[in-house]
């Protein structure tokens, strides 16, 4: 698995985890987390679209002519997939600083905030 594939898979699990905790008003939140908090430039809308097609999350569609999805929540199928596969996620640790690596683990649900 390439570094890009590992990062995409990791982002998928971040989306599943956070949307299982509570309904996410806008997918812009994920863009902010990935870009600002973690320094990852990725098309979160494409990942969300794939997760919707797979039945792992649901959304009320796009926000008026924008690339952002509204009201995103994890389905039971998504929660089960997350629970069964979260420990298989490979975090490309060399890609992140120590502080960002801690944030990755927190967003993945593998570590509690201190």
Predicted regions and their residues:
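Short amphipathic alpha-helical interface segments
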Residues: 3-38
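Short amphipathic alpha-helical interaction segments
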Residues: 6, 37-54, 68-69
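Short, flexible helical or helix-coil boundary motifs
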Residues: 14, 18, 22, 41, ...
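Short, amphipathic alpha-helical interaction segments positioned at domain boundaries
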Residues: 76-104
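A short, conserved structural fragment
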Residues: 52-63
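Short acidic DE-rich linear segments
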Residues: 104-114
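Accessory beta->alpha helical hairpin/"wing" motif in late/C-terminal subdomains of nucleic-acid enzymes
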Residues: 62-84
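Short, Lys/Arg-enriched, disordered terminal segments
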Residues: 1-5, 112-114
């Amino acid at each position: 698995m390439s570094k890009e594939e590992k990062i995409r898979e990791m982002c998928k699990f971040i989306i599943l985890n956070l949307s299982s905790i509570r309904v996410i008003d806008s997918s812009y939140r994920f863009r902010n987390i990935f870009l600002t908090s973690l320094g990852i430039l990725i098309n979160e809308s494409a990942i969300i679209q794939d997760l919707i097609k797979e039945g792992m999350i649901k959304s009320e569609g796009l926000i008026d002519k924008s690339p952002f999805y509204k009201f995103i929540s994890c389905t039971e199928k998504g929660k089960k997939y997350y629970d069964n596969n979260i420990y298989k996620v490979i975090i490309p640790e060399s890609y992140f600083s120590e502080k960002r690596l801690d944030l990755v683990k927190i967003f993945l649900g593998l570590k509690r905030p201190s």
